Amino acid sequence: MTRTTGAAPDRAAPAAGETPGGGGRAQVYLHAGQIAVAAEPTAIVTVLGSCVAVCLHDPVARVGGMNHFLLPLHVEREQSARFGTVAVPQLVEAVVRAGARRASLVAKVFGGASVIGAFRGARNLGDENVQLALRLLDEARIPVLDRDVGGARGRKLIFHVDDGAAWVRQL
């Protein structure tokens, strides 16, 4: 696992005795199309391919959350968090309802691999998902402090909602 923190990616391994899911935190596994938010120490875990996870954190309130979406744009009849256009605004609203101040929110973005990129002419859903997430966060004026996106391999992600730390391991 590598840990990402701060404005620039920090790819150092966890310090001795430091474990990604440790520290007495509850642990939640997030499936595609889900959103998890917590106001107490919690490690949210997910596995991403072309899907994207947006992690939001309020460093003052120590509240945060994560979404995991599959496709960039929702269809008219379905307002599901499986779609980025639904999942990102829902995550922002949920984190604020849990006690975060919108003006204090910072983001990290992960995933968006081109796992089917070997097929010529295949649509690059991973890249579309990443671009949508970055655009929606920019429109919401939420700064993106870190990202680990693209490539051809999936990722396992662990995010601590209370301190904003994230660990990523390519699969």
UniProtKB/Swiss-Prot annotation:
What InterPro entries would the database entry show? CheD-like_sf, Chemorcpt_Glu_NH3ase_CheD, Cytotoxic_necrot_fac-like_cat
Provide the reaction this enzyme catalyses: L-glutaminyl-[protein] + H2O = L-glutamyl-[protein] + NH4(+)
Q: Which GO terms describe its molecular function?
A: protein-glutamine glutaminase activity
Cite the record's Low complexity compositional bias ranges: 1-18
Identify the keywords attached in UniProt to this record, alphabetized: Chemotaxis, Hydrolase
Q: Which SUPFAM superfamilies match?
A: CNF1/YfiH-like putative cysteine hydrolases
Q: Which family does it belong to?
A: Belongs to the CheD family.
Name of protein: Probable chemoreceptor glutamine deamidase CheD 1
Q: Native species of this protein?
A: Anaeromyxobacter dehalogenans (strain 2CP-C)
Q: What is the lineage of its organism?
A: Bacteria, Pseudomonadati, Myxococcota, Myxococcia, Myxococcales
What's the name of its gene? cheD1
